[in-house]
Amino acid sequence: RHGFPDTLCPGVNKAIDKGIKVVIYDVEIQKCAQRAVQTQQSDAKMASLVLDQMLKDVGTGKPVGYVNVLGIAPLDRRDAVWKDYIAKNQWTQKFMTGKYTPSTATDTAPMVDNALKSNADVVAIYAPYDELTKATLSALGTNPNLKGKVKVYGADISTADIELMSAPDSPWVATGATDPNAIGAAVVRTLALHMAGTVKEGAKEDFPPILVTSEMLRSKNIKNMDDLRKNAPELNISKVSSADWIPAVTF
């Protein structure tokens, strides 16, 4: 799980004091470990891509639902964008629910089910983590009266997510996505650049996401991550945190 500053910062600072180069990913420790190099998905971009699609699909001034868990760095960053879109587009947030556990999808589904039963007028739900998106799909499945009436907007991508999105009549219509393999390679490249002195202490690197829609998956017959990589080569982000002396890696 994502670490917290009070547990991470002492060790990170101790390592840096000893001359060890430290690159962190997707944790918020800049305030207490300012010399570490920060890397992360561009969560603001990930959220805005999806919420722009939601706006296009449902319009302004609509009742919507929200499934998220605060206190986790990337979800907090996506939450900030959500709040901005709520205000700008006059959406009425009818509920916010969600729970982060070892079984997030299973444990959150009943909470979303209860929220839907009390707010059956929502036309869209934003669930910016794929386990929360899965919980939302499960809850909608137990409310057949809402079939075809609620669109779901998520985050992340995997072969399992692709199967859910491309299923017939799936309410999951869009997600913001990066390739975990490509992200891992980019973090390693960032470390190499930091060790070489090109990336300085305290630097920050954001890795850009793309928008994936269910329409795209179906029209291009994308069944898994390999298919998606072939159809969306920009997922590879091979030019991010790169140099001519670092071998290019593709997936």
Region annotations inferred by a language model:
Residues R1, K21-D26, Q38-Q40, K62-N68, ...:
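Structural recognition of the beta-strand scaffold that forms the well-ordered cores
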Residues P10-K45, P63, T159-A167:
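Flexible loop/hinge segments that line or gate small-molecule binding clefts
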Residues S48-G98, L191, V199-I222:
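An alpha-beta-alpha
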Residues R1-D17, W82, T101-L164:
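Hydrophobic alpha-helical
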Residues Q38-V64, R77, A105-A109, I157-I162, ...:
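Hydrophobic alpha-helical segments within soluble ligand-binding/sensing domains
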Residues G11-K18, Y25, Q53-G61, Y85-N89, ...:
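Structured segments of extracytoplasmic/periplasmic soluble domains
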Residues D179, V187-F251:
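Hinge/cleft segment of the Venus flytrap/periplasmic-binding protein
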Residues D76, Y85-K99, A124-Y129, L140-M195:
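Extracellular/periplasmic periplasmic-binding protein-like sensory domains
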